[in-house]
Swiss-Prot record:
<feature type="transmembrane region" description="Helical; Name=5">
    <location>
        <begin position="264"/>
        <end position="280"/>
    </location>
</feature>
<keyword id="KW-1003">Cell membrane</keyword>
<feature type="transmembrane region" description="Helical; Name=7">
    <location>
        <begin position="357"/>
        <end position="377"/>
    </location>
</feature>
<feature type="topological domain" description="Cytoplasmic">
    <location>
        <begin position="1"/>
        <end position="49"/>
    </location>
</feature>
<dbReference type="Pfam" id="PF02949">
    <property type="entry name" value="7tm_6"/>
</dbReference>
<protein>
    <recommendedName>
        <fullName>Odorant receptor 22a</fullName>
    </recommendedName>
</protein>
<keyword id="KW-0472">Membrane</keyword>
<keyword id="KW-0675">Receptor</keyword>
<dbReference type="GO" id="GO:0099094">
    <property type="term" value="F:ligand-gated monoatomic cation channel activity"/>
</dbReference>
<feature type="transmembrane region" description="Helical; Name=3">
    <location>
        <begin position="137"/>
        <end position="157"/>
    </location>
</feature>
<keyword id="KW-1133">Transmembrane helix</keyword>
<keyword id="KW-0812">Transmembrane</keyword>
<feature type="topological domain" description="Extracellular">
    <location>
        <begin position="378"/>
        <end position="397"/>
    </location>
</feature>
<dbReference type="GO" id="GO:0042048">
    <property type="term" value="P:olfactory behavior"/>
</dbReference>
<feature type="topological domain" description="Cytoplasmic">
    <location>
        <begin position="108"/>
        <end position="136"/>
    </location>
</feature>
<comment type="subunit">
    <text>Interacts with Orco, via conserved C-terminal cytoplasmic loops. Complexes exist early in the endomembrane system in olfactory sensory neurons (OSNs), coupling these complexes to the conserved ciliary trafficking pathway. Interacts with snmp1.</text>
</comment>
<dbReference type="GO" id="GO:0007608">
    <property type="term" value="P:sensory perception of smell"/>
</dbReference>
């Protein structure tokens, strides 16, 4: 069903040419709309840069400030539930501004990484290897659409309910607009801005996921090549050595690819790790003490979306660490015992390098892994425990 509207989420046949960079098709389109890429025609650079400045000043600077001003301007009108709902989104929005800035600054690095993907694609000659690339490309685009559905559902669940209740869903401050007298205008403006904000946040969450997904694609292809070393009879020792050398080049390209992306994702995931415990903690307090049924459903969706910002990426990083161990096993288990001295010495050098796992760190501090992710999520329970011990929830009710 979805593939009728989004054809790139379906695996393409081998008769069509597909490149690894095609996994970013839908993501790049959204980024282009925010001014985060470059126009194809150079004569549009100036208007595009002006659009970039306008959109990002409004969304990354003025929008978080508008939520903060609303606290100062109309704090007494907030109920406890409304305040917590606004606070959890406001905190996440400030973090999202930093995440978007890191992603925007890393545009050139991401372009360098795509060039390296093109070089890795040149090694995919057999139908089996090309089919693997096609499958991962479709998976990358599918993840982008899936995140759009998850994130959009949060807005769709919130906006109609609060509109019918004649209450503002996110309590933003708009100068020269009376939010009570011009309720529908301010509510529609809130809905539009929140939708744009979550799509910006989506880009910062999906970009690392798809990028490392394509890294895992080529790691899996390299594992298969390592298994097949010296498996074709009738070749000379020089040809076997050249085959091993090509695998070493592939591994070097993979390391360069990850190194190009490392500074881009380091800051993004670091900010999210700092936020996830606090945001989930505030959401859990709101859910446990102040939510109605409908606002509780919306809060659960928000908590799910916040968890999706780090969980899939951390899980993928763990899988890549395991893949690196498997790569060294594949090389060691290949048919090298009858090889000449040159081949064996090259293999030993390569085996040593393969045993170094491909890892990412958040801000140069936290290793990006499921263990770190779970440790940060546990902070949410610490926040709830503090609130319950001091009976703060009862005081606000």
């Amino acid at each position: 069903m979805l593939s009728k509207f989004f054809p790139h989420i379906k695996e393409k046949p081998l008769s069509e040419r597909v490149k690894s960079r095609d996994a970013f098709i839908y993501l790049d389109r959204v980024m282009w709309s925010f001014g985060w890429t470059e126009p194809e025609n150079k004569r549009w650079i100036l208007p595009y840069k002006l659009w970039l400045a306008f959109v990002n000043i409004v969304m990354l600077i003025l929008l978080p400030i508008s939520i903060s001003i609303e606290y100062l301007h109309r704090f007494k009108t907030f109920s406890a539930g409304e305040f917590l709902s606004s606070l959890e989104i406001g905190v996440n929005m400030y973090g999202s501004s930093f995440k978007c800035a890191f992603t925007l600054i890393g545009f050139k690095k991401r372009q360098e990484a795509k060039v390296l993907l093109d070089q890795l694609d040149k090694r995919c000659l057999s139908d089996k290897e090309r089919s693997t690339v096609h499958r991962y490309v479709a998976m990358g685009n599918f993840f982008d659409i899936l995140y759009h559905i998850f994130y959009s559902t949060f807005v769709v669940m919130n906006f109609p309910y609060f509109l019918l209740e004649r209450r503002h869903a996110w309590r933003m401050y708009f100068p020269y607009i009376d939010s009570d007298e011009q309720f529908y205008i301010s509510s529609i403006a809130e809905c539009f801005l929140m939708t744009e904000a979550i799509y910006m946040d989506l880009c910062t969450d999906v970009c690392p996921l798809i990028s490392m997904l394509m890294a895992r694609c080529h790691i899996s292809l390299l594992k298969q090549r390592l298994r097949n070393l010296r498996s074709k009879p009738g070749r000379t020792e020089d040809e076997y050595l050249e085959e091993l050398t090509e695998c070493i080049r592939d591994h070097r390209l993979l390391l360069d690819y990850v190194d190009a992306l490392r500074p881009v994702f380091s800051g993004t995931i670091f900010v999210q790790f700092l936020l996830i415990g606090t945001v989930l903690g505030l959401s859990m307090i709101n859910l446990m003490f102040f939510s109605t049924f409908w606002t509780g459903v919306a809060t659960c969706l928000f908590m799910f979306d916040v968890s999706m910002e780090t969980f899939p990426f951390c899980y993928l990083c763990n899988m890549i660490i395991d893949d690196c161990q498997e790569m060294s096993n594949c090389l060691f288990q290949s048919d090298w015992t009858s090889a000449d001295r040159r081949y064996k010495s090259t293999l030993v050098y390569f085996l040593h390098n393969l045993q170094q796992p491909i890892t990412l760190t958040a801000g140069g501090v936290f290793p990006i892994s499921m263990q770190t992710n779970l440790a940060m999520v546990k902070l949410a329970f610490s926040v709830v425990t503090v609130i319950k011990q001091f009976n703060l929830a009862e005081r606000f009710q």
